[in-house]
């Protein structure tokens, strides 16, 4: 049971570290393509608008 909990916590931490959050908008909420292009410009795979009223640009890694 302890190993399952430990693996779950490690997976949760790993998934959290895989996302880079950009707070300044970068086109969100009206231009998700601009957010995606911004994320690619900082060597991420892409991005999308997220958060309250889609005002935050979230980048995902390669």
From Swiss-Prot:
It comes from Olivierus martensii. Changing residue 61 to A: Moderate decrease in ability to block Kv1.3/KCNA3 potassium channel. Has the structural arrangement of an alpha-helix connected to a beta-sheet by disulfide bonds (CSalpha/beta). InterPro entries: Defensin_invertebrate/fungal, Scorpion_toxin-like_sf. Residues 1-24 form the signal peptide. One of its GO terms (cellular component) is extracellular region. Changing residue 37 to A: Important decrease in ability to block Kv1.3/KCNA3 potassium channel. The lineage of its organism: Eukaryota, Metazoa, Ecdysozoa, Arthropoda, Chelicerata. This is Defensin BmKDfsin4. The keyword Secreted applies. Pfam families: Defensin_2. Negative results: has no inhibitory activity against Gram-negative bacteria. Shows very weak inhibition of the potassium currents mediated by the Kv11.1/KCNH2/ERG1 (11.6%), KCa3.1/KCNN4/IK/SK4 (3.9%), KCa2.3/KCNN3/SK3 (7%), Kv7/KCNQ (5.9%), when tested at 1 uM. Keywords: Antibiotic, Antimicrobial, Calcium-activated potassium channel impairing toxin, Defensin, Disulfide bond, Immunity, Innate immunity, Ion channel impairing toxin, Neurotoxin, Potassium channel impairing toxin, Secreted, Signal, Toxin, Voltage-gated potassium channel impairing toxin. The keyword Cytoplasm does not apply.
């Amino acid at each position: 049971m302890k190993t399952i909990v430990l693996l779950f916590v490690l997976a949760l931490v790993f998934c959290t570290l895989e996302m880079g959050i950009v707070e300044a908008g970068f086109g969100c909420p009206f231009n998700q393509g601009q957010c995606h292009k911004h994320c690619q410009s900082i060597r991420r795979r892409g991005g999308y608008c997220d958060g309250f009223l889609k005002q935050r640009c979230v980048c995902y890694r390669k």
